[in-house]
Amino acid sequence: MEQLHMYWKNEGQTVPEYKLPEGYTVKKITEVPDGVEQWLEIISHGLVDGVRDKAFYQRVMVEEKGFDPEYCFLVMCGDEAVATLDILLYTWRNDGHLHMVGCKENHRGKGLATALNLLALKTIQELGFATASLTTDDQRIPAIKSYYKVGFQPDLSTQDYVERWAKINAIIGR
């Protein structure tokens, strides 16, 4: 099944500053000595199935159009990376695309994804992009709630999308 799409328009609105719970910080993957290894561990918690290695990181990140490691963020709890979000810079369409957003199970429900989403929108706005976009799966209800919370809107461009979003919105009471 094709992933769902969501969009955010940069209309000069104020994007709130992100706030992390006490004990958490954000670093760029380039600032963490074993950042790639820690990123691989995070994404194994619900984003991908099976063992992943540096070749996987190379394929889904480094070789991805618009990838810049300066925009790959890790939420740290001490020396442990517990959540991640990457912004792909789609300059050809004036868009910042949220990519590989994930969090370890034992750190979910603490607002880390919302903080990362706000950081991404603020960054995208500061870079001057007109829009932000993302793709997600129907069953990722907590993630979808977080995307709605920061202002993303669903793509309703096809009847299939309309029907799928109606089911999701019924589940979350929207």
Annotate each PLM feature.
Residues M1-G23, K28:
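Acyl-donor-binding surface of acyltransferase catalytic domains
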Residues T25-W39:
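A short beta-loop-alpha structural element at the N-terminal edge
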Residues I124-T136:
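Conserved GNAT acetyl-CoA-binding A-motif
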Residues L134-I144, D160-A166:
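Conserved beta-strand-loop-alpha-helix junction that forms the acyl-donor binding cleft
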Residues S44-C103:
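A conserved beta-strand-loop-helix scaffold within acyl/acetyltransferase catalytic domains
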Residues Y7, Q13-E17, L89, G96, ...:
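Long, contiguous binding/interaction regions
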Residues M100-C103, G109-K122, E126, K145-K149:
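Conserved acetyl-CoA-binding loop-helix of GNAT-fold acetyltransferases
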